[in-house]
Each structure stands twice: as C-alpha cells, then as structure tokens.
C-alpha cells in the first residue's frame, strides 16, 4: 500500500534507515497529512539520535512540522507501536522499527548465525473502519500529549 492521504505513526524504537527513508518521502509530500510521535527516552539513543539529527538537518521545516519527540500524557514512555495509513489500514504490535525489533538476518532468508538478533514481537494489521478510526484518534491524542509535554519542558 502506498500512502497517499495520511500517515499517523507512533513508534518507541525508530532506527531503521530504510523505513525512515519511506517516512521522509511522505514528510516531503505536502499533500499527505503526516504526524509522527516518538518516545523521548528511546529517541535519545545513539542510532535514533543520529538518524533523527540527519532528518532534521536535511529538512528542518518538515522535521519540525511532522515529528514530535516526547512522552505519554502521564509523563511515562510513549510505548505505542503502530500506525494508520490513509484511514484505511492500521497496524499495532510490539515490533520496534529497529534491527533487533525486526530481526536481523545474517544469512539471507535464514535466521541464525553469528550476530543474529531478533526479539519476540507481534504485529497485527486491521481494516475494520471502526477500529482504524479509534486507533487513529488514539495516535492523534498521543501526538498532542507529546507536543504539550514538550512545550512545558
């Protein structure tokens, strides 16, 4: 599915350069509504910080407009991991957008080998209009909470 209308995304771990490039293409398309919420503690990690600094340097306006790095409304980690694309499909689960979250295949197509990393994660995709709308509203609320928290600090 190619996003053409909107992307609402909340991610705890966000250090996958390939997925980041896809997100940044969406950020650069001014016809797509795009809100990205990332956890403050996780975004401060070495890989995340480097990736996000590169995004901010390449497109400061796009980065400031679409990304919020913060915490939950209760001042805890923002641990939701999911998105809604075009108001049609949602996904939520425990998978971080990171090498260990997605699983790193050392041998093409086969798990295992020296350096293999993979967390035990789940990801559910859904298209029920009511579930998609409710999850999109939750992602928007989390984005606003992170913005408000950032403005206070």
Residue ranges and their predicted role:
Residues 1-2, 16-24, 28-153:
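HKD-type phospholipase D/PLD-like phosphodiesterase module
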């Amino acid at each position: 599915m190619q996003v053409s209308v909107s992307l609402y995304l909340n991610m705890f771990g966000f250090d996958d350069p390939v997925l980041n490039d896809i997100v940044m293409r969406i950020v650069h398309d001014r016809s797509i509504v795009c809100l990205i919420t990332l956890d403050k503690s996780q975004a401060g990690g070495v890989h995340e910080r480097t990736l996000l600094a590169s995004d901010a340097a390449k497109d400061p306006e796009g980065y400031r407009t679409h990304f919020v790095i913060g915490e939950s409304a209760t001042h805890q980690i923002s641990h939701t991991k999911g998105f809604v694309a075009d108001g049609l499909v949602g996904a939520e689960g425990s998978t971080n957008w990171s090498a260990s979250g997605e699983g790193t295949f050392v041998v093409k197509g086969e798990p295992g080998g020296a350096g293999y990393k993979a967390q035990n994660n789940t990801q559910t995709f859904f298209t029920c209009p009511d579930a998609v709308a409710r999850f999109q509203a939750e992602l928007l609320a989390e984005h606003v909470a992170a913005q408000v928290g950032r403005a206070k600090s």
